[in-house]
């Protein structure tokens, strides 16, 4: 079972990835 911290970090990483993709596009 993932801890809340791990889940938050995963979500943040995904959001940053999307932001980077949009900036580079």
From Swiss-Prot:
GO terms for biological process: fatty acid biosynthetic process. Residues 2-25 form the Carrier domain. GO terms for cellular component: cytoplasm. 4'-phosphopantetheine is transferred from CoA to a specific serine of apo-ACP by AcpS. This modification is essential for activity because fatty acids are bound in thioester linkage to the sulfhydryl of the prosthetic group. The keyword Lipid biosynthesis applies. It comes from Alcaligenes faecalis. Belongs to the acyl carrier protein (ACP) family. This is Acyl carrier protein. Carrier of the growing fatty acid chain in fatty acid biosynthesis. The keyword rRNA-binding does not apply. Pathway: Lipid metabolism; fatty acid biosynthesis. It comes from the Bacteria. Keywords: Cytoplasm, Fatty acid biosynthesis, Fatty acid metabolism, Lipid biosynthesis, Lipid metabolism, Phosphopantetheine.
